[in-house]
Curated annotation (Swiss-Prot):
The lineage of its organism: Archaea, Methanobacteriati, Methanobacteriota, Methanomada group, Methanococci. It comes from Methanocaldococcus jannaschii (strain ATCC 43067 / DSM 2661 / JAL-1 / JCM 10045 / NBRC 100440) (Methanococcus jannaschii). InterPro entries: DUF530 (IPR007503). This is Uncharacterized protein MJ1110. It comes from the Archaea.
Length: 486
């Protein structure tokens, strides 16, 4: 086993050597999109990523064996009496140990982020439903903070809000309601306790039990995370923001162009130019701020205010009214638009992941490592895909995945069935399912009574399924009933 110092040195050198791989990936992805890619070049970049992945896995294993993940465990734990000279030596040695411990922790964190980024990049390059735009924008060298530091402040805010979606705070995600109620049936009162995942539980109860009386409601929360691994969450958040930052910036500018008059736009553009110039000058040290440069930063801020005053953009230390209004509008728009676009793009990919893949395929895929295989409705409430009720479609698909194996019916194309039953044939074709395949599947399940009960429970129009069962004979129905009893 190599020494700690050599391991840290070799890991840093290897990670630094990955700086150019993002540019190579960008070139390859551009050729894939233009359909001019040479298969050899694609194979070469995939092979490079696979080799890097092996090296990163080896580095991670060695570091964890040497307890890089708990580097401060024995720092400062010395027993016995020492004279003043001995205490000075101990203090000096403790400082050295803390520095080494910090290096251990830092390099292991970087290796873990790089490892996750490589897994995700490979999956999105090689799987049919992968987002080909994502791999070049992932922190493949593990330096996710370096990418984040280059983001404007509103994107950093969006990054944090996105992590909050993937890692809920407080009590967690509201997943269901446990409801106690009194049902009146033929003049008799009957007490029931039911569990409902739909937040519109009153409508559900009315449709299922009629005029029932709710006596108590308990909200059930889960602290589980839709993506369990913290490194995956960070890498995906950085990767998606980096991928769509230009689209976000364009959408913000288009909106600002409509809302501000020419004077306000002129003031805002000049203000942003000066702020950018100030930031570039302040960032010469690579973004590392310590106590010594805090004063210098404050002086720079005062200098910026003086420049803004001279330019006529500030008065008495405050923005002039047209600029103040423009800044406020830009800040509000930037936060909203960046979050909306990020959620939309991420939702599209996650929705397709759940829609197309079976539970086994989801468990094996690295498109979204450590993602929940079959999440409850509450974990999907953030999803947003134009024209699609993501939560209802996926919730129904998951219920069908649970039921259909009892009848020896394969799970391929179940996503298309869920799209048809919740929406229509246009939605089925939009996601590239073949109508004939879905019709054949609908005919197989049309006479399965438990499926109809699931649809009724989900407030789905059962007649959309039943019309495919009219061609079935009675003996087919009996055969399916026999299968369900096996």
């Amino acid at each position: 086993m190599e020494s700690t110092s050599n391991l840290i040195k070799n890991a840093n050198e290897f990670l630094d050597s990955l700086n150019e791989i993002n540019d190579k990936l960008k070139e390859v992805v551009g050729k894939i999109k233009n359909k001019t890619i040479d298969k050899t070049k694609l194979s070469d970049i995939i092979l490079t990523l696979e080799k890097n992945l092996e090296i990163l896995q080896d580095l991670k294993s060695k570091m964890e064996f040497l307890e890089f993940d708990s580097p401060y465990k024995n720092v400062g734990k010395l027993k016995g009496g020492y004279d003043s000279e001995g205490l000075q030596e101990i203090a000096s040695y403790s400082t050295y140990l803390r520095r080494i411990a910090s290096e251990k922790k830092g390099i292991l964190e970087r290796v873990r982020h790089a490892l996750v980024a490589h897994k995700i990049a490979l999956a999105h390059l090689t799987e049919d439903i992968g987002n080909i735009n994502l791999p070049p924008n992932l922190p493949l060298d593990g330096s996710y903070k370096k990418i984040m530091f280059e983001f404007p402040p509103y994107l950093v805010t969006t990054y944090k809000e996105f992590l909050d979606i993937l890692e809920p705070k407080g009590r967690g995600i509201l997943t269901s309601y446990t409801i106690s109620l009194i049902v009146i049936d033929k003049g008799k009162r009957e007490f029931k306790r039911i569990k409902v995942e739909d937040k519109n539980y009153e409508k559900y109860i009315k449709e299922k039990f009629g005029n029932a009386i709710i006596t108590s409601i308990k909200r059930n929360f889960s602290k589980n995370k839709i993506i369990d691994d913290q490194y995956v969450r960070r890498v995906l958040a950085i990767g998606y923001l980096n991928t769509y930052k230009d689209e976000i910036e364009k959408a913000i500018n288009e909106k600002i162009d409509k809302l501000l008059n020419e004077e306000e736009k002129k003031y805002l553009n000049r203000y942003l130019e000066l702020c950018l110039l100030f930031r570039e000058e302040a960032d010469i040290s690579g973004g590392i701020l310590d106590v010594r440069c805090m004063e210098e930063r404050k002086l720079k801020e005062l200098e910026l205010k003086e420049i803004l005053e001279k330019e006529g953009l500030y008065r008495d230390g405050e923005p002039i009214e047209p600029l103040k209004k423009a800044i406020k509008i830009k800040n509000e728009l930037s936060k909203k638009i960046s979050k909306d676009i990020l959620i939309k793009r991420f939702s599209e990919d996650v929705f397709k992941f759940y829609l197309y893949k079976t539970p086994d395929e989801r468990a094996r895929s690295n498109l979204f490592p450590s993602i929940m295989i079959t999440p409850q409705r509450g974990f999907l409430s953030w999803m947003s895909v134009d024209g699609i009720n993501c939560v209802d479609v996926l919730d129904l698909k998951f219920k069908l995945e649970e039921e259909l194996p009892k009848y020896q019916i394969p799970l391929k194309n179940i996503g298309g069935v869920a799209l048809y039953l919740i929406h229509d044939w246009d939605a089925v074709e939009r996601f590239n399912f073949k109508k004939k395949d879905i019709e054949d599947l609908l005919k197989k399940i049309a006479l399965i009574e438990p499926i109809k009960e699931i649809l009724k429970d989900k407030n789905v129009d059962v007649s959309k399924l039943e019309k495919f069962g009219k061609v079935k004979k009675e003996k087919t129905k009996k055969f399916l009933d026999l299968l369900s009893g096996l």
